[in-house]
């Protein structure tokens, strides 16, 4: 990707997902979904049992990923998804699991 026009359309969001989201393949499924949507960023487990993610892409890509995160993979039981825009000049190269 190159050009200022394209960069202006890239958004970055920090997301927290709570519920039964660890030990159910949530991160792996999140990586698969992010790759399908051509998102960049990462996903990781937190000590409190929740999952965090950094999503980077266009507004429609982010919206579709947030919609998917609200239910996650079949074994998950999502009770809450919170997100906020994260202003950064950093550009992730791919989406990965931590």
From Swiss-Prot:
Pfam family name, one: Acylphosphatase
Catalytic activity: an acyl phosphate + H2O = a carboxylate + phosphate + H(+)
Entry annotated with the keyword Hydrolase: yes
PROSITE patterns (UniProt xref): ACYLPHOSPHATASE_1, ACYLPHOSPHATASE_2, ACYLPHOSPHATASE_3
The organism's place on the tree of life at top rank: Bacteria
Family recorded in the similarity comment: Belongs to the acylphosphatase family.
Protein name per its UniProtKB record: Acylphosphatase
Lineage, highest ranks first: Bacteria, Pseudomonadati, Pseudomonadota, Betaproteobacteria, Burkholderiales
